[in-house]
């Protein structure tokens, strides 16, 4: 079982998904995957140790791949997705949960409001030294959590990241390094 749970917001649009199925494009060529694979290589994260999921199940019926998932407006839909996310975490018992972007971080915050209280209102990405948390309780699971900028917008947003004495890409690499060393020992 993978030890790292990587949480995005959603998969994409129906059109994008259908183009992948038709062989017109490869998902790994999109900015999200290109930038994520580069970061994970820098952080020495083995993809075989990772399970990739999304906070929201389903595809967008819109043309835009970015921004808040349209289903966010439906409280019942959000709650069902939170239940499913919690179920996945309880089954996997990951040592590390990595969120991609503010919306995924906000969904994880909703499962552990006491331990991730600083992540409320998307502060996991805004405030210095708040993107990495150890010993986060989610149900019966205790994990380290790292909130990363969404890979598709990574280079536009990295300037705001700060952790310890590091900024930008170095800050996110330091958070990942601390999280990995925390459960490697």
Protein language model annotation of sequence segments:
Residues 65-78, 82-83, 110-185:
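C-terminal capping/extension of enzyme domains
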Residues 1-31, 38, 134-141, 181-185:
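Active-site and ligand/interface coordination hotspots across diverse enzymes
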Residues 10-14, 56-60, 102-106, 150-154:
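Short, solvent-exposed loop/turn segments at secondary-structure junctions
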Residues 4-6, 46-54, 96-101, 147:
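A structural signal for short, well-ordered beta-strand segments and their strand-loop junctions
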Residues 85-105:
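Proline-aspartate-enriched helix->loop->beta-strand connector
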Residues 14-28, 59-78:
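Surface-exposed cleft-lining segments at the edges of enzyme active sites
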Residues 44, 90-92, 138-141:
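Short, conserved loop/helix-junction motifs that constitute active-site signature segments
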Residues 30-72:
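Short, surface-exposed acidic-centric catalytic microdomains
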């Amino acid at each position: 079982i993978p030890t790292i749970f990587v949480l995005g917001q959603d998969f994409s649009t129906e059109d994008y998904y259908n183009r992948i199925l038709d062989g017109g494009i490869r998902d790994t060529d999109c900015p999200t995957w290109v930038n994520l694979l580069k970061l994970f290589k820098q952080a020495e994260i083995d993809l075989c140790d990772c399970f990739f999921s999304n906070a929201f199940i389903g595809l967008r019926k819109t043309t835009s791949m970015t921004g808040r998932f349209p289903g966010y407006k439906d409280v019942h839909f959000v709650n069902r997705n939170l239940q499913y996310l919690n179920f996945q975490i309880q089954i996997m018992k990951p040592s590390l949960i990595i969120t991609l972007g503010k919306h995924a971080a906000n969904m994880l915050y909703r499962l552990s409001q006491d331990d991730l209280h600083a992540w409320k209102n998307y502060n996991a990405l805004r405030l210095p030294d708040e993107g990495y948390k150890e010993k986060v309780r989610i149900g019966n699971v205790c994990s380290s959590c790292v909130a990363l900028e969404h890979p598709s917008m990574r280079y536009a947003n990295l300037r705001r990241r700060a952790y310890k004495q590091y900024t930008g890409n170095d800050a996110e690499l330091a958070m990942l390094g601390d999280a990995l060393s925390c459960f490697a020992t």
